[in-house]
Design a protein with these regions (language model features):
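Structural preference for beta-rich elements and adjacent junctions enriched in aromatics
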Residues: 1-240
């Protein structure tokens, strides 16, 4: 079992192939990532989810920028992201980001509508600063993705890294800024077999507490709560309630 703690101490991670040799997207499009900022990403899967482990080397780890923010707000932080297209058709990416302060962001991206950050999936991640850089570990359940029912999967895949203090962005599969969009220039993930698209049902409970004070200095509180429901009707439509 993989524990999402950012330690990468499970032996199974060592058996996974390594994605490396990232290429700069901005500002010097096409330039190789410096050796002292090299990035290594591994992917594993089981019957329920896909797992991502990223080691982002940095020769000055004390300078890694991190800011605690709300969900879907990157703030002033280094970022790691994974882009997944379960149909490998260049049409729609599911993008998952973790910043160096351990914050999450996610969105659905299409060429037509751009990035939609109102979409929120349920997934796990952990970011840890180390003496060599920083680590991100992620567990993305299949319920957060779209993919075919084929026994052998071929997914579009890319990884993203931003080094905020240097204003530099890198991707694993080269994104030529003179050509199409991110969704049309992904790499390919093969080897995932015998998984089935699950029922896409998320239940998201929430609560809030309000404190009120009137002119007579009387203070009282109000507790509110509720439940958001997201249900995948089919590959194209999701019901939000």
């Amino acid at each position: 079992k993989i524990e999402i703690d950012g330690n990468l101490d499970e032996s199974i991670w060592q058996s996974a192939a390594v994605a490396t040799d990232f290429i700069m997207f901005e500002p010097d499009n096409g330039k190789a990532i410096p050796e002292n900022k090299r990035t290594e990403v591994r992917v594993l899967y089981d019957n329920d989810a896909v797992y991502i482990a990223a080691m982002m080397y940095d020769d000055n780890p004390h300078k890694i920028l991190r800011e605690i923010t709300q969900r879907d707000n990157f703030g002033t932080s280094d970022i790691f992201g994974v882009f997944i297209n379960g149909f490998n058709d260049g049409q729609q990416d599911f993008q998952f980001f973790v910043n160096a302060a351990d914050g999450q962001a996610d969105c659905i991206t299409t060429d037509t509508n751009g990035e939609d950050y109102s979409w929120d999936a349920v997934w796990k991640s952990k970011a840890v600063i180390t003496a060599k850089g920083w680590i991100v570990e992620m567990r993305i359940p299949y319920a957060a993705l779209r993919f075919s029912g084929e026994n052998k999967q071929t997914w579009g895949l890319n990884f993203f890294r931003e080094i905020r203090r240097d204003r530099q962005k890198f991707t694993w599969n080269f994104i030529d800024s003179k050509l199409g969009t991110f969704t049309q220039q992904t790499g390919v993930l093969e080897g995932i077999e015998n998984i089935k698209p699950p029922t896409r049902l998320f239940l998201l409970p929430y609560s809030s507490f309000y404190v009120n004070a009137d002119a007579r200095q009387k203070t009282y509180g109000t507790l509110k709560g509720g439940l958001d429901l997201k249900y995948g009707i089919n590959d194209a439509f999701t019901l939000d309630m």
